[in-house]
């Protein structure tokens, strides 16, 4: 028998490891493969792009916000992997009625360690989960052992038209904090919100990070940031395009993503 708790506090009890799993969370799809259990996946979202060369064979069941529930039911999953943030409450309710669901919702990088261990229990991949969790734990320790003299003020939008940002009460926000940066929008009460560039300019960011997801920032978007042209980030050529997965994909990518962001932050202070 397998018993594991998810982010809602619910205990998921199964008689044996699931052999048919649907993942509606791209980062967890990648994590399942990293755990060596990609063979149990029977359906994923159209945004599940990793690992390349393996995920392409899987049935697509729509997007994270608009999954095809009938198609999912037809796949007869024993467990559906969800995110409290990426997926809709109504889809959770519908899928829960059809079978078992496992919900993830890490808002802190350190919480990913427990998530990975829980997935290891659920999928009967405890040893692989222990290795991945240990890697993240070691990365957190290594970064923590190198204190930051100062933390650069950073602006990291996630959308344009309208411009949107995120607070410190998010996984991405905590990734920036642990990596050594200070999110200029970190103290906002909302977790995700629209923002005016004039507000950002007033905060005088020293570093601007432009991820390639969810909005795909490219060179053509830089002129739209002209309101920031008098900020330290602009004057010191500290506007960088970054890998959005490193910032927001929690799971097996967390350790490498954190190291990647910490390096960018440190290099910005040289």
Regions found by a protein language model. Name each.
Residues 1-4, 10-14, 20, 79, ...:
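Extracytoplasmic substrate-binding proteins
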Residues 2-5, 19-91, 184, 203, ...:
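A short, structured surface patch at a secondary-structure boundary
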Residues 37, 56-57, 97-99, 179, ...:
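Short, structured coil segments at secondary-structure junctions
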Residues 45, 169-193, 241:
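His/Asp/Glu-enriched short active-site or ligand-binding loop at hydrolase and phosphoryl-transfer sites
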Residues 49-50, 222-241:
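Short glycine/proline-rich, acidic loop/turn segments that cap or connect secondary-structure elements
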Residues 51-58, 71, 112-116, 219-220, ...:
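Short, charged, surface-exposed secondary-structure boundary motifs
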Residues 71-74, 94, 175, 199:
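Well-formed, non-transmembrane alpha-helical positions, independent of function
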Residues 88-94, 207-225:
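A ligand-binding cleft/hinge motif common to bilobed small-molecule-binding domains
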